[in-house]
């Protein structure tokens, strides 16, 4: 049981880090793109925020 609990803790961190990494990569790619980088960045930021909140709530509950 302790092992399972221990495994769950890093799992949540991994998910958050993965989302942050994906968002960073997406932002980097969009930044390289000359067309509508600001709009996409704003949309991506909002989407990531929603996903992060959803995962945070899911992991907590």
UniProtKB/Swiss-Prot annotation:
How is this protein positioned relative to the membrane?
Answer: Single-pass type II membrane protein
Domain of life from the UniProt record: Viruses
| Subcellular localization | Host endoplasmic reticulum membrane
The keyword Membrane is annotated on this UniProt entry = yes
Disulfide bridge map? none
Give me the Cytoplasmic side stretches, as residue ranges.
1-12
A Pfam family the protein falls into? MNSV_P7B
* Chain segments annotated as transmembrane: 13-33
**Record's GO cellular component terms:** host cell endoplasmic reticulum membrane; membrane
- Asked if the keyword Magnesium belongs to this entry, the reply reads no
Q: Which GO terms describe its biological process?
A: transport of virus in host, cell to cell
**Record's keyword terms, sorted:** Host endoplasmic reticulum, Host membrane, Membrane, Signal-anchor, Transmembrane, Transmembrane helix, Transport, Viral movement protein
What is the protein's known function?
Cell-to-cell movement function.
Q: What is this protein called?
A: Double gene block protein 2
Q: Which organism is it from?
A: Melon necrotic spot virus
